[in-house]
């Protein structure tokens, strides 16, 4: 290696753009200036359209992007490992920042994938309307106890006659035949054809019905595949050997209006013919929520079953392919090693935050609300109107009517009459039939018949049920009677089958307030079909269950993702996960392993770009970078060691102890709370207990439990109080929220303390004074405190001071009685009657009330800033010395006070440390990396 004295005095050059946090350490303005005429360094060496204008010796130099095929593959049940040999030729420099893995394979999203709300089949049918069906039963009034076939249905298609051949639908007049045309039974009468207009009346009608062997389902959601090109759906009959024949399973049943006579005989000529058939009936996207009995067989009772659409479940790869590549997992890390030295430049730590760091880095570089399909970059989001309900009622001042199709709505007919000549018409005898007027005139008396529906209220109520009620915790739901659900509560079938009483989240709940439902606060709001980012990523793959995918996956590991690789030969390998719960994300969060999803990788290639430099320029750059004064240094964006501390269910206190160490270069703490169920074990290649596929806050930053913290106290063993005791509350105790606020310490009409608000403004934006100041736009990004802080308040009945208060439980509350279902999303029942809930909080009769306050702050990590200089700023002794002066190593004790939760959770605590890697490439095929981390040199925060 050349000695420094032999090298020219290069000035510094920053190659990563103004706000990038990672850059080549010393090096290269003079170099940039010298080469600027034919190669601009403007966009971090990455403009693939720029090629050198001179000194190009071969056409190979112009070939900027190369594909590397793996030299070794290892495809196992849970992972796919690909190894590449990167050969960087002389006078070339490979830009690792431009590399990506190009992966092709096949994805089966499983039967739980449903990329839409509602149903695709007969969505306009009433939820409880049956298909035209038959069943076997005894006649109710007949003495004969034999089982007979009963038919219920619609015969919509008119005809001119009915004979043994069926319904006559026309006459063949070609070649003077004049022969009747009968319905072709394999597809006629067609269900979509009927009377064409209001006056279209025939004497004979035909229709189709499902035979008793086809088990009844409501029309809403029913589908039967066609069995011929005309759209007919009848099954084929089988012969004695069980082989399918070419004959359809169709039987004609004839029906006559009872009571007619022909002469002395009873009139029995058929008026209706029903073509009964068996079909392949299925309900691909609905399920039954009301079932009168346990049997699925066709019966009169099952005519009144009621359907509900299956819950939407979008499934796609995670944001920026989180979870697809192994990071921070011992034994599964990658390799980037020079073949000459075999030293691996990738040194992984389980407590590094590679995925989360990448998410936050992207947020600092640009607008995360803009989707970038190539890296599958569409950030998880939720509809703010679902998380926090602004219930301002409905604007339904005008009634909404629906009218009969004929604009009258009556079938009453009237005889034309007139007054006899010379009479005045005041008695019946003065009237006679009018021969000039028809004997049957259809006239409507009074106003047009109409029915009223409150469209606005129904839309609002429907929104609340679909978006809020169905996402309530499972403890608020029940299984409909006579419906059997699987025991595994993580399956789609179980989640889909559970229903909730609509009155739990109705239009009158918290009316007039801006408030989130208390049970919903601790439910992951990103696991929702209105997660626009997930919906976009799901739709990128298409709308079918089976997907041949072709994706491009970036490298995120901070030490090598921006590296300039100098000439030599290198081994590069990485592991890719195949665990569907880790690499796929679903909006319901069901266990995709159990629900039949799978992934297969067919090929993993690596694409890499060389800098388009003239050879002599590249060799100059190489010579510079080989010099150890120009080693490449990279900071981890988060620069933090993380630690997960378990919080048992119902626990409210979390003590933490860190053994004595030197706190030099320590910047502070970030913390939030995670659910154990939603946090995989990164240390294992495959976590068998991770039975969940929703958003993973630990990796993707979808935090939502920040509001559950009450206090945090921080104490170093020296017991030095926090420097600069100018905070509102106790120096070493941070009170985050207080429910009883006698001193008026809360802020923004919620229960967050002014103290905590100021600490957050200080640590996020360096706004450390009390005054109105909004952070600059480039600081106030998607994951920032100011953007996500949501204060709320509401009034509720004062149960203590209102003497007439009665705690009426849900089954005994009624509101909209007669117009809604009782405690179920089923047919309306009851009678119109005054509501008994909720108590009025407004008007002349407003009852005594109390105010409740709270806040939500999602996506953010709470931060407490710290400077290791504080250790030298404690209270001075009589000698004018700091007590800490003699001993610079200190133990740390922290205590977190949190709200109790019904399930085990984790405290996710980041210690903001100095985390940097220095990469040195002294010779061909040699790459050395030094990782520096202080105060936690390696491992996790407990070592």
UniProtKB/Swiss-Prot annotation:
InterPro entries: Adenovirus_Pll_hexon_C (IPR016108), Adenovirus_Pll_hexon_N (IPR016107), Adenovirus_Pll_hexon_sub2 (IPR044942), Adenovirus_Pll_hexon_sub3 (IPR016110), ADV_hexon (IPR037542), VP_dsDNA_II (IPR016112)
GO MF entry, a single one: structural molecule activity
Record carries keyword Phosphoprotein: yes
Inducing factors: Expressed in the late phase of the viral replicative cycle.
Subunit annotation: Homotrimer. Interacts with the capsid vertex protein; this interaction binds the peripentonal hexons to the neighboring penton base. Interacts with the hexon-linking protein; this interaction tethers the hexons surrounding the penton to those situated in the central plate of the facet. Interacts with the hexon-interlacing protein; this interaction lashes the hexons together. Interacts with host dyneins DYNC1LI1 and DYNC1I2; this interaction might be involved in intracellular microtubule-dependent transport of incoming viral capsid.
Its job: Major capsid protein that self-associates to form 240 hexon trimers, each in the shape of a hexagon, building most of the pseudo T=25 capsid. Assembled into trimeric units with the help of the chaperone shutoff protein. Transported by pre-protein VI to the nucleus where it associates with other structural proteins to form an empty capsid. Might be involved, through its interaction with host dyneins, in the intracellular microtubule-dependent transport of incoming viral capsid to the nucleus.
Note: All late proteins expressed from the major late promoter are produced by alternative splicing and alternative polyadenylation of the same gene giving rise to non-overlapping ORFs. A leader sequence is present in the N-terminus of all these mRNAs and is recognized by the viral shutoff protein to provide expression although conventional translation via ribosome scanning from the cap has been shut off in the host cell.
HAMAP family xrefs: ADV_CAPSH
Name of the protein in question: Hexon protein
Organism from which the protein derives: Human adenovirus D serotype 9
Chain's gene name: L3
